[in-house]
């Protein structure tokens, strides 16, 4: 067997399929681009869905890739098994309507067994097939020459994820030999069984059916091939490693952890699990952050937080008790740099994010662990088998413990956790539902009509907004028609069109279509599968017919305002990087006639000074009157120029480059101004956070910017008029008013304090004595909780002692406060527990510390009854 590094295996795979006429697709970012059905890119085929469902026709039906992927459905198994990972690479080759079973099988066998490529011993390879797939069985026997004892029929060899493409599959296994299993009585010791001897290395999926919504299966218009080979498994075989973790993909990370911990790998099973968890999780977190994800409390951000905290938990097994994960990022970058330079290129930023997250967790971890240990100890002492949901929630809410982390600690002590109770506790406090867990959703059922419309349509709208063209296709209700009459909507493809199809954030053009017999409006334009511009139209007069000569006219006003915003977006993108750092990446955009919206990755808040600086930079470039140069060139040449690419977008060999002087160079298919002076003015309207690590800037240009500035100026003039001052002196006038207001508030609080002191004599007079404890429970007049707290302060000053509960009505609400003296606390009384009981009796809730608590209620009519309960509660505590 050849001795190969992981990088060599990856490159061999891609070189092989390139030689076989495949286009090598770049690895897509882990954060899906325009695919809300999945949390992460979790397979090679996840980036190919648009080709498999027929919504886009690829330039070359043969494709291959090495795709970084994340799957997190088995996190608890990572580190405890030989092959579970949260981050992995999938090598795949794909055919969209080109070669089918024979081609896929022949390619796979050649790559695995040819001395030019991997060079495996054919006798060590076994395959599994779907029992009804006679074609595949025949190919393996007759084309490849496998004997029947190397072909295993398995009922589960049918790939089906619901509605959409499906079909049988054939898996290839490598026999690692008797050392990995030799028990003839083991019912799982066969290719496809649960064992370590026969390792699955490649899955060939023969996508030949549509799984229809009614549950039936019909042949696909085009048969497809989707294959997947796990790089980590393949490398473990080639490098003769007992598990994936002993390969060159993981061992440098493990060696670095050894240095940090002062503990050796391979001497303790418990320690080895910790090493594996850390090595796996740092790869996932580093790549995910590099691709735009950031730790948070929901969605993919929650996954990152959970992985980091799980790694920190296991690091304690290795006696690592301080932030350290960030130190591993350069190691990950170096291992993967030959094919994935993104981690090494962003090392500083990724380290900063991870270190910040680690430091936050360490601040609360030890305190949380102490509480968890108490909870676990109490559960054992009381023979409870389940950790209560309320306890899990407290650890999650106060100390940042993911419920899964608590569950792992509980499992170590032989206990389970109350998931239902935890969810009940979460329900009231959860403001936003967590994002759906990662799983591949059904692809669309393949459609034939648009995919079969192959006549080319040229876009001529970069330099013209009017054009005479011909109607190639008219489509109504998914059917080709010869004509469309007034009052109907349809889809149209023209021979040439000046109408821009929505893409890259730029909205579609609108406008008119005129023929000798009809008039129609263009409402929207999208890309058809074969890359023609597909126009959605409404016919207003007469009739439009296939073959008609038509005059197409784009709405010039809307187009003019749109292109101002598009070029301004490019300037803003560059200004963001110059101001905040090169880590900023575009996460989405909207370019419309009236505004622009730009979403971008950034870890942290943006200051007013930074916003002002960005706005100034963009306006300076506008006023410099820079020519905008647009040209097509090979992508390699564009990269040499330093052109920025849209994050997550895929590009062909020839790309369109938009250059604003030397300041901004981007790959872009949109329409732009000829000179930055055409933009006129740029004004940021708002800046907000829209999710974990994602910010949004909205801005206006040209006349909309002028209107915005004018509105703000008018508002300032109105404020100045009300303040009886000039616009220039308005800020100073407001400061004086604020100072006056603070003084009035101070005087008011002083007066309220005196009134409270005066009222206290009546409130605290003649406390009830219950079992030697002084108890005061009264309704008082207090305008807010602050005044109630003043009553408590007076009670403490008078050293009355015992228990105090006060309630006040404000409109349709109740404010409650309680206090317990030090002596009463020692006797077992608790202000928080008492007030919780009182509050529930007047429609509220709340709680607090043993010495003081406050709460609210929604039923003022029940306040008297609630306060009467205080005496009952005290007596119950004494019973």
From Swiss-Prot:
Single GO cellular component term: cytosol
Entry-linked InterPro entries: aa-tRNA-synth_II/BPL/LPL (IPR045864), Ala-tRNA-lgiase_IIc (IPR002318), Ala-tRNA-ligase_IIc_anticod-bd (IPR018162), Ala-tRNA-synth_IIc_core (IPR018165), Ala-tRNA-synth_IIc_N (IPR018164), Ala-tRNA_ligase (IPR050058), Ala_tRNA_ligase_euk/bac (IPR023033), DHHA1_dom (IPR003156)
Principal subcellular localization: cytoplasm
Cofactor note: Binds 1 zinc ion per subunit.
UniProt keyword annotations, A-Z: Aminoacyl-tRNA synthetase, ATP-binding, Cytoplasm, Ligase, Metal-binding, Nucleotide-binding, Protein biosynthesis, RNA-binding, tRNA-binding, Zinc
Cofactor dependence: Zn(2+)
Gene3D superfamilies: 2.40.30.130, 3.10.310.40, 3.30.54.20, 6.10.250.550, Bira Bifunctional Protein, Domain 2, Threonyl-trna Synthetase, Chain A, domain 2
Entry EC number(s): 6.1.1.7
Binding site for Zn(2+): 566, 570, 668, 672
One term of GO molecular function: zinc ion binding
PROSITE patterns per record: AA_TRNA_LIGASE_II_ALA
Localization: Cytoplasm
GO BP annotations listed: alanyl-tRNA aminoacylation
Catalytic activities: tRNA(Ala) + L-alanine + ATP = L-alanyl-tRNA(Ala) + AMP + diphosphate
Keyword Transferase: no
UniProt superkingdom: Bacteria
Domain notes: Consists of three domains; the N-terminal catalytic domain, the editing domain and the C-terminal C-Ala domain. The editing domain removes incorrectly charged amino acids, while the C-Ala domain, along with tRNA(Ala), serves as a bridge to cooperatively bring together the editing and aminoacylation centers thus stimulating deacylation of misacylated tRNAs.
Function: Catalyzes the attachment of alanine to tRNA(Ala) in a two-step reaction: alanine is first activated by ATP to form Ala-AMP and then transferred to the acceptor end of tRNA(Ala). Also edits incorrectly charged Ser-tRNA(Ala) and Gly-tRNA(Ala) via its editing domain.
Family statement drawn from the similarity comment of this UniProt entry: Belongs to the class-II aminoacyl-tRNA synthetase family.
NCBIfam families membership: alaS
UniProt protein name: Alanine--tRNA ligase
């Amino acid at each position: 067997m050849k001795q190969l590094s992981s990088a060599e295996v990856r490159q061999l795979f891609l070189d092989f399929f390139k030689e076989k006429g495949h286009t090598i697709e770049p690895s897509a970012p882990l954060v899906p681009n325009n695919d809300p059905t999945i949390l992460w890119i979790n397979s090679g085929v996840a980036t190919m869905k648009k080709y498999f469902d027929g919504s886009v026709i690829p330039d070359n039906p043969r494709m291959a890739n090495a795709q970084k992927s994340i799957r997190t459905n088995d996190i608890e198994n990572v580190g405890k098994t030989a092959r579970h990972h949260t981050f992995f690479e999938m090598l795949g080759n794909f055919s969209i309507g080109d070669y089918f079973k024979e081609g896929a099988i022949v390619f796979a066998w050649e790559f695995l067994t040819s001395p030019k490529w991997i060079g495996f011993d054919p006798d060590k390879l076994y395959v599994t097939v779907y029992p009804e797939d006679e074609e595949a069985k025949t190919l393996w026997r007759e084309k490849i020459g496998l004997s029947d004892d190397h072909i295993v029929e398995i009922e589960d060899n049918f790939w089906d994820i619901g509605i959409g493409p499906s079909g049988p599959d054939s898996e290839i296994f490598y026999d690692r030999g008797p050392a990995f299993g030799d028990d003839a009585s083991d019912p799982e010791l066969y290719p496809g069984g649960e064992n370590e001897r026969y390792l699955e290395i490649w899955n060939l999926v023969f996508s030949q059916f549509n799984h229809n919504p009614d549950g039936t299966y019909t042949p696909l218009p085009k048969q497809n091939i989707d294959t997947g080979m796990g790089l980590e498994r393949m490398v473990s075989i080639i490098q003769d490693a007992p598990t994936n973790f002993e390969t060159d993909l993981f061992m440098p990370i493990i060696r670095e952890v050894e240095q940090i911990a002062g503990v050796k790998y391979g001497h303790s099973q418990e320690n080895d699990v910790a090493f594996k968890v850390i090595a796996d999780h740092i790869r996932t977190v580093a790549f995910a952050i590099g691709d735009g994800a950031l730790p948070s409390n929901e969605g993919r951000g929650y996954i990152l937080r959970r992985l980091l905290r799980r790694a920190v938990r296991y690091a304690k097994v290795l006696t690592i008790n301080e932030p350290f994960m960030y130190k591993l990022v350069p190691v990950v970058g170096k291992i993967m740099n030959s094919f994935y330079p993104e981690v090494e290129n962003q090392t500083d930023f990724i380290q900063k994010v991870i270190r910040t997250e680690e430091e936050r967790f360490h601040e609360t971890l030890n305190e949380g662990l102490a509480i968890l240990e108490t909870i676990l100890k109490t559960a054992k002492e009381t023979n409870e088998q389940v950790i209560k949901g309320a306890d899990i929630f407290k650890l999650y809410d106060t100390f940042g413990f993911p419920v899964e982390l608590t569950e792992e600690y509980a499992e170590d002590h032989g206990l389970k956790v109350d998931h239902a109770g935890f969810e009940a506790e979460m329900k009231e406090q959860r403001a936003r539902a967590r994002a759906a867990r990662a799983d591949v959703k059904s692809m669309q059922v393949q459609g034939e009509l648009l995919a079969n419309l192959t006549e080319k349509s040229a876009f001529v709208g970069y330099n013209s907004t009017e054009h005479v063209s011909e109607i190639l296709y008219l489509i109504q209700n998914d059917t080709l028609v010869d004509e469309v009459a007034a009052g109907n909507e349809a889809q149209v493809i023209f021979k040439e069109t000046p109408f821009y199809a929505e893409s890259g954030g730029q909205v579609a053009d609108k406008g008119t279509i005129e023929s000798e017999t009809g008039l129609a409006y263009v409402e929207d334009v999208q890309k058809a599968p074969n890359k023609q511009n597909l126009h959605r139209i409404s016919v207003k007069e007469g009739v439009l017919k296939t073959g008609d000569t038509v005059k197409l006219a784009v709405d010039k006003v809307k187009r003019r305002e749109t292109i101002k915003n598009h070029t301004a977006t490019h300037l803003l993108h560059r200004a963001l990087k110059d101001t905040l750092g090169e880590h900023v990446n575009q996460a989405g955009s909207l370019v419309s006639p009236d505004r622009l919206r730009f979403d971008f990755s950034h870890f942290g808040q943006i200051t007013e000074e930074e916003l002002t600086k960005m706005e100034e930079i963009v306006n300076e470039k506008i006023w410099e009157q820079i020519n905008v140069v647009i040209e097509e060139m090979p992508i390699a040449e564009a990269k040499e120029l330093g052109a920025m690419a849209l994050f997550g977008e895929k590009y062909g060999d020839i790309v369109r480059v938009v250059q604003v002087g030397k300041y901004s160079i981007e790959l872009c298919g949109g329409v732009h101004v000829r000179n930055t002076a055409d933009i006129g003015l740029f004004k940021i309207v708002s800046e907000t956070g829209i999710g974990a690590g994602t910010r949004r800037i909205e801005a206006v240009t040209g006349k909309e910017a002028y209107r915005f500035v004018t509105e703000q100026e008018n508002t300032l003039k109105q404020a100045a008029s009300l303040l009886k001052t000039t616009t220039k002196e308005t800020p100073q006038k407001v400061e004086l008013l604020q100072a006056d207001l603070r003084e009035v508030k101070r005087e008011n609080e002083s007066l309220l304090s005196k009134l409270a002191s005066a009222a206290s004599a009546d409130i605290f007079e003649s406390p009830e004595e219950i079992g030697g404890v002084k108890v005061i429970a009264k309704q008082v007049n207090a305008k807010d909780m602050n005044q109630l707290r003043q009553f408590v302060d007076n009670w403490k000053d008078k050293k009355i002692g015992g228990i105090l509960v006060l309630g006040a009505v404000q409109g349709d609400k109740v404010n409650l406060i309680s206090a317990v003296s030090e002596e009463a606390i020692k006797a077992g009384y608790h202000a928080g527990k008492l007030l919780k009981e009182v509050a529930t009796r007047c429609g509220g809730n709340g709680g607090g510390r043993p010495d003081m608590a406050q709460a609210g209620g929604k039923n003022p009519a029940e306040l008297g009854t609630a306060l009467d309960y205080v005496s009952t509660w005290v007596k119950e505590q004494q019973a």
